[in-house]
Amino acid sequence: MASSSVSSLQFLFVTSQTPSSLKPNSTLSFFSLPSSSLNLSLSSSSIGHSASIKPFESSFSTRVALSDFDQLEDDVEVAEQPRFSEDLKLFVGNLPFSVDSAALAGLFERAGNVEIVEVIYDKLSGRSRGFGFVTMSTKEEVEAAEQQFNGYEIDGRAIRVNAGPAPAKRENSSFGGGRGGNSSYGGGRDGNSSFGGARGGRSVDSSNRVYVGNLSWGVDDLALKELFSEQGNVVDAKVVYDRDSGRSRGFGFVTYSSAKEVNDAIDSLNGIDLDGRSIRVSAAEERPRRQF
């Protein structure tokens, strides 16, 4: 077993000539380490002759980036990754497919210290799903990043950035912007609004609706819509929030325009990893109408 000691800290990326070795939904984590305490113990049997370690220059002089690999997971010895409050997490949507975790980290470090970056990938195709999550060090940096990068253009796309936890409730809100000035970015947080949805009191057909459970607290209507749009035309996407606290209850509903899209979504998305959780997708049971 070969051991490599790093004296001057830089970004380190372990790369392989085999693209399939990369783990989809890999998380890029940043954390401080003393310059003398980092040791990478790499098993020659798990890496092979094709692996290499390349320095990556960054303004972070005392931070280390480690990308998660299937075959290196047990061979890289580092400090345990700390947990961060959901208040420090940002959702980043409408990303170009070429943007990976390293590129996203390089952008958001302009607003402060980046702790964790995750771009969400499709397990089968390995392609980016066009959205991800960024965790900053402080709430002030979260606000700065949201103000600085919401609407920021990358490769011709204006990215969407908003904080993970639910903001204060607003009446009659919807993502698409109810006319008359009552719109809010995330939408659906007061139980009377929806992402793409029915405006002016029109009801949404619930016959083609799926239930989505075990959602991370940082997933909102926008993230849900971004994910499920890959399987068809999303008529409505809504995360259910607690009326008192305003926080996500960890589940939501997505409505499609056809039964085929519902079946495709269940087959393709049930059990996939979204922001560190294996989501549950099933046909939603229509609740019986109240009798008065």
Curated annotation (Swiss-Prot):
UniProt KW DNA damage keyword: no
Residue stretches making up the RRM domain: 88-166, 208-286
Subcellular location per the Swiss-Prot or TrEMBL entry: Plastid, Chloroplast
Annotated region described as Linker (Gly-rich), given as residue ranges: 167-207
Positions of region (Disordered): 165-203
Pfam family for this entry, one: RRM_1
Protein name in UniProt: 31 kDa ribonucleoprotein, chloroplastic
Annotated Gly residues bias: 175-190
Keywords associated with the record: Chloroplast, mRNA processing, Plastid, Repeat, Ribonucleoprotein, RNA-binding, Transit peptide
Organism: Nicotiana plumbaginifolia
The keyword Plastid belongs to this UniProt entry's keyword annotation: yes
